[in-house]
Each structure stands twice: as C-alpha cells, then as structure tokens.
C-alpha cells in the first residue's frame, strides 16, 4: 500500500524538476503532459533518478485506478444536443450545392468535393463540441477519462459512439458519398449499416493481410542498414547541407551539428555545436535581424565521409537521450525499426477506427467568422480571381475565390469585422499564401468561411493530380454546344433516351450496334467475335413448290448435303429494319507486301449459316438466313485492316436463296482463301450457296424443280414426293412491344441507321405563355422555368426533351464523342484533380515500399529524378566559380554547401562534385516524401533515420569509363572506394575513373553487398553463391548480422570500444 506521504514526496520531486509552471493549482497528467514531464526530467536528472520517479508514478496510477473502480455504462454515452440542427443545416447547404450543379456552375468533381468537405467539417465540428462538453461539464465521465488521458481509444472513436460516423470508405479505399448520420448509441438505418460494413470489412482484411507487408518492410530495412554504427567522433567532412531558419524548419534543426562557425551581430555559435531547442529559439528570435544569413550550414548523414559507419558529429543528437550519440550505438538497427514499426502499429489502428475515412484535407487551414458583420481590409489585396478544380468549392454571392500571392517580403493580410455600428469585433492577420472567400464590404454570417491557408507542398503531396473517372448517371445522347464558358470549363449535355436493345421476335425493327466501320487487327492477335450483318423476315405470297426428300445409304466416312427446292420471294411491303450488309467486297490490306502469298495457308475464314426447321409452332414465320461473319480464335499473322462497308436494304429487292439441310451435326462452313486472291465477292440477284462440311469425301446434290442431278454409286432406299397446291400466306405472329414512345432515326455519313426512342417520361409539353425567342434545338438551362432541348415549337406549345447539363475542366479526357450514345454507369470521361481521398497507412505503406525499392510512382520516379539532378549538376559545374558559395538547385527545395571550390577541375573532381550534390539534393527530396507519408498519420519520424536509409540506397555508383583502373564498365562500386581510387590515379598521373550515381532499391542493394552472410541469408542463395564464388569476394564480417551468424561478438555497443 502506498502512503499519502510517499505521493507527496514524488509530487515534490516533480515540482523540484520545475515541471509544474502554471498559474493553475492543479495540472492534469494526461499523455501529453507526461511526455513533457519525462523530457524535462531526462534533461534535469540522470537515468537512475528518472527511472525511479517514473516507476513510482506507475505504482500511484495503478493504486488510484484500483481505488476508483472505473466502469463504462450506456448512461455514460451522452448524446450531442445540437446534432439534428447541424445536420439539417448541412442538408440545406448540400441542396443548394445541387442547384449549382444543375445550373452548370460547378463540375461533377466540385460537387463531390464539396459534399466530402462539408461532411468532414461537420464531423470535425462535432468532435470539437464533444471535447468542450466533456472538459467543462463532465470532466470525470469514464468515456472522457479514457479518451483524453490517452489510456484507451481516441476522440475519433468517441465521436462514432455519440456523434456521427460520417463518411465511410469502400474496399478500394475511396469515400462513399453517403454519410452515416447515426452513431452506435442511437443506431443506424439498414442502408447505413450496409455502408458501415464496407469499412469494417476493410479493417479486417487490412489487419489480416497488410500486417505481413509492414513486417516484411521492416525486415528489408534492417538488412540494408544493420551494419551501420557510430565508430569515431569526427570524419572531417568539409561539405554540408544548408537549412533555412524559420518556424517550419525549427524542428528539423534540433539535434543537428554546425559545420562551421555561425555569427551575426550579437549571435555566435561555434562549429561542431549541437543545436538544442534553446539555440533554435535564439535563432528564431533573431531571424528578423539577420541581414544576409537566413540559413545555417549543418552536417548531415548524407555527407558523412565514412564508408561503412558514421561519425558522432554527422549523426548529431541521440533522440532517446537528447544528448550527443555515444560511440558504438547501433544506429542502423534503430533507424530501420523506427521506420518499419509505425507501419505495423498503424495497420492495426485502422482496424479499430472501423473504416471511417481520414482526409488529406488537413493540409487546408480554414478560418471562419465568429460573428455576423461586415468585412474590411487593412490594405489592398494582391491576388487573382480563381475558378478552378484546385480550390475547395466554397461559394459566396458571386462564386468568386481570390488566390492571394505573397508580396516581396511576406503576405500580411488583416481582416476586420465590424457590426452595423462600425464597432470592431474581430481582426485576424494572415501570413501564409491561401484563398480568400470574401470581398471588401461583404456582409458575412457567423461561421462563414473567410480564408483558407494552403499548407501543401505540391511536389511531395498526396494531393497531386490524378485522373478520376466519371461515369454517366443516365442513358442518352451526348451533345456539346461548342460554347466554352471560359478557358477552364466546357459544357456538355446528356439527353435522355431509351436505346433499343431487343430481338426481332419482340420488335419489327432491330438495333444493330455499330461502333466503327473498320477494325485494325494487330499481329498475333487472337480474335473471337461475331457480328450479325442482317436478318431477313419475309411474308410468303401464293406460291407452289415441290418438296422432295431422298435418303441414301452412306459409308462411315462419307458426308453429303441435300438441297431443297428454292424459294422465290419478294418483299410485300417496306420493312422497318436497319441493318448492316456486307457491301460487295471484303478486302484485306496488309502493312507490308508479302512475296509468297497474301494470306497464310494456316488462316481460315469461318462463316456460319443458321438453318430452321419448319413445324406447327413456327410455320407462320420463315427466317431464311442470317448473314454474319465469325472470327473464331483467328491468329493474325500480320497486321491488316478489315473494312466493313454499309448499305441499306431497298424496297422490293428480289433474291433467290437455297435452303440447306445438313445430314451431319456440324453447322460451320469453312472457306479457305486462295493465296492469289485478296477479295471475296458477293453479288446480288444471283443464285448462290455455300457448301457445308468442307471435308475429304463430301458429296452435294442440287434439285431444281423436278430435275434430279445424281452421281451417286450408292443404293437408294426410298423416294417420295409431296405437292402443296393450296395458296398460303404465312404471317409473323404479332407481339406487344415493350418499348413505348416516339422513334427517331439518326443517320451517319456511311448510311448506317440507328434507332432510338424518346420515352414519354423524358418529353413534356407546355403552353407558350408569351415566351419569345425560342427556336428549335435551343439548349435551355434550369431556372428558365424549363430545362432541356427544345425539339418542337408549335403555335401554342413547346415540346422539350429533358437533359442533364455538365461542365468539365479543359484538360478532361473524353472517352465518348459528340452524338454518341452512352448508357447508365458507362465511362464518360476522366479528369485531373486534387480531390482529397482517404489517406491511411494502408495506402502509405505501399507508397513507402515503392520509393525504397526504386519503383516509379505516378508523381515521382526515383531513378529518373536522380539521373536528371546529376545531369543538371554535371552541365552547370562551370557556374560554380565563387568560393564558399551556396548553390541552389531550383527543382529541389534544398541547398548544398560547397567549400574550397577550385576552378581547375579534372574528371575525378567533376564526378565527385556532381555525385555529391545530386546525392544530397535527391536524398533530402525523397526523405521528405517518405516523412510526409507518416506525418499524415500523426507519426513524426526523425528525419535522420530516413536519411540513413537513403544514404545506403545511393551509396553505389555505376562506372561509365574505368580509365586506367581494373574495373569494368557498368560495374557498381561504393562511391568512397572509387573516390580513393581516383586520388591514387591522380597522384600517379593516370586516367581517372568517371562514374554516375544510381539509386538501388532495398532488395537490390542487399544483393550487391560484399557480405556473403547478409546477401545469402536474404534471398536468392543460389545466385549469391555463384556470384561470390566466381568473383572471389571476401566477407570481412563488418556488420552485426554476419557476426551473429558465425557466433562472433558484434562490432557495436556503447561499451564495445572502452
């Protein structure tokens, strides 16, 4: 049992440590204050004293928790009082946004972004209100104690319990634009429950599958840097990186070592001094007084001159102890675990959040008005009117957004809000670049958006432009008025139609889908497609004909076909059919001439013909023949274009056909094109037939009238004749059409007819009521009392077809052309956007993995970027002729410090300088990208850990010209080894080695290690054994892994060198 006197003693120790520095008498020790307390204690006392205090604090915590008997019941889940009112206001706002969309003021993407942003703001507002209610009214609520102390859960989970769940993610990680307005306390509707299951299932799948991915990432990182530890105090490097002195870079300055003396007026800092938080504050306070030096040159891990290890000065501060790192510290293992471990933990965290979307929109810092009033600016605003997809769509009275541009020094905009009596109520000074949503003299309401600061680095941001597909919401015809609203936005209309997709049995007109009148067939393509050319229905007039049937005894391998008497017919009336007919020729064009033949003998062109049996049920209709072409698994030897020409069926055309009945089971007709023939002619008004079963012993016979042509050495079994004397008219059975409305024909250049119908629901008429200036085929928007496409204008009425107006940015990629038909949920276009999507570590881990493996990302290609930067430095080295100058590469947001520059450079010096600058700039760039992935999840990984990984991935160089050395072109060697070789070659007046930097991924760099133990135990053991055997490599056991394998003491540890 802990006594009260002991508790007082420990609290006295805390006061002695100057931790409690507040005017309040009581300080709540939550997670944040505990972190601060441990940090102060660590700086104030030794490790043993700090350990003693923290151990006793733990005992106090367990004792008080047992004594309190904390429990959580359903009564502790208090509902949020203003939730219904807030949701009603949000719905009204979203309805207004829908009106903007129908008025063609905003694009579909902006509509979607506004919905997502609005519900995200609602969720954040509810979270803030829950915090205030709990902290003020119920600070001892068990739910509040757990969430705010950091012991269990977070405020996001509390919001799902008593607030609203908000927008959920689907299995692909995208947001479902249907917010769950209920919570677990109130319950959810059936629709909300099913959407909620999306996110819950995603959490389960991610936990089951992605945890292994995070663990494997950690394993590869450890293999890359396990051999790195602190070996000496100083490597005597002369180059470093330049870090700007400002508030944004203040955290990155802490723990770095100065490369050279820094002095400016009253400030002097000696070189090799570690920058502490106190020094950072001193530099920031004197920032405005600095004349020409607004940056400071520091050492970096990327510039350390040691090959296998690091020095104390280049590494800097030990983050765990806030002191200079000790010699022997295994910093490689620490760096690998620091990057890999958050991935494992955050993967598990997505399971507990239940799939609720997290937004990358946190990069936007918004300021809202606290009162009603009028806007007044202190000085004129410098900026441009912006109307684009970059901004988050917030709408003022004039739908204008101002993008502010910084002045020569800094942007300093002060907003004043006055009431009606011109009393100042509120003022806010804005320092960052951003978007202004109000104008001078505007009347604003409480809570209205005033300004948004942009806190985005577009090069490294996950909000980079990506193509987002847009699918049509309706079926109809695409029309573009060809009138741009401005240079950024273009309008588009989709008019509602019912496109017919029916069989001939249901409707007397058939829809034939024709996408284009030619096909380009590539070499080695396998084609399996079937297109109907046309079908013929006919009505039989009074006609007599003989029907003859004969049977023959056939041998086993003999096949034959019988042909009945032909039918002679003509059309009885005009047929309402639209069809595509093979017009005269079927031509094959090749991309090059062949010497031997046009078509290979192995290519078969297959045709099919459908035969129909006549019985009682089907005798009223004859389907004579279906003309079609079929490519069945046809292997194209060379590229050619197949042209299908089109022609209409004319009235009272007369045809003669033969109807075949095959005695075999096969119904495929095979034609082999002659190698000297490049066209197949089909002529009208000629008797023609295609023989079936093109095989070895095939025999055909043809009967004309009563004539018999038989050359058959077989025994005849029986013969019978039948004659039809009566006149018959066979009519097609009538059926009710399942399509209603008015049919409209639509004809293209090649006489291909389309048929589509306008349903009664998409047409409406109204009286004119003195409306003027209305003409046929006018586009009429909403709020003109009518909206759509004017198709009829009579004396008394208008007839209007409903349509959906859309606008898209000018760089949109359209997948449909004007006057094309589009079906519902069919892809219409793709457009670039900075649309915020859900960002969790599940999307972050693959991005980090790709970067560290050297694979290209949509916005970044590591290997290409490194090569470009190296070429840039190689071409511009002639401009670096000033000693002690700062060199700034414009494409990358970092500076490299160059000391003791010599104008007369040889090839070795040029290669070293170009490699050094490109490696430093590229390393800082890719390290910042990886760091941002974790920062979006609230995990702050020390920059030096990422620099350590990148340093190893860029440590090898590729030899371009070996010079007088014994290396081989394209051989990959450590850069410091080449640097020392060049020094030796230069002293002997021999030709030096020229080389270029390369970026190898984690897997590649591990395989290229000189250590057989590391490379062999990683993967591809057989390949590693062959490589090390033939090249006779020696493993010097320099790393930790190799020594553990061979049961030797590891060359690391803070007591190893003493």
From Swiss-Prot:
Cofactor annotation remark: Binds 1 Zn(2+) ion per subunit.
Positions of transmembrane segments: none
Record keywords: DNA-directed RNA polymerase, Metal-binding, Nucleotidyltransferase, Plastid, Transcription, Transferase, Zinc
The enzyme's E.C. designation: 2.7.7.6
Binding-site list for Zn(2+): 235, 304, 311, 314
Cofactor annotation: Zn(2+)
Enzyme class, broadest EC rank: transferase
Localization annotation: Plastid
Catalytic activity: RNA(n) + a ribonucleoside 5'-triphosphate = RNA(n+1) + diphosphate
Entry keyword Transit peptide: no
Main localization category: plastid
GO aspect biological process, one term: DNA-templated transcription
Record-level GO cellular component terms: DNA-directed RNA polymerase complex; mitochondrion; plastid
InterPro entries reported in the protein's UniProt record: DNA-dir_RpoC_beta_prime, RNA_pol_Rpb1_3_sf, RNA_pol_Rpb1_4, RNA_pol_Rpb1_5, Rpb1_funnel_sf
GO molecular function ontology, one term from the record: DNA binding
Protein task: DNA-dependent RNA polymerase catalyzes the transcription of DNA into RNA using the four ribonucleoside triphosphates as substrates.
UniProt xrefs under PANTHER family: DNA-DIRECTED RNA POLYMERASE (PTHR19376), DNA-DIRECTED RNA POLYMERASE SUBUNIT BETA (PTHR19376:SF54)
Description of how the protein assembles with itself and partners: In plastids the minimal PEP RNA polymerase catalytic core is composed of four subunits: alpha, beta, beta', and beta''. When a (nuclear-encoded) sigma factor is associated with the core the holoenzyme is formed, which can initiate transcription.
Family membership noted in the UniProt record: Belongs to the RNA polymerase beta' chain family. RpoC2 subfamily.
Name assigned to this protein: DNA-directed RNA polymerase subunit beta''
Source species: Helicosporidium sp. subsp. Simulium jonesii
Gene: rpoC2
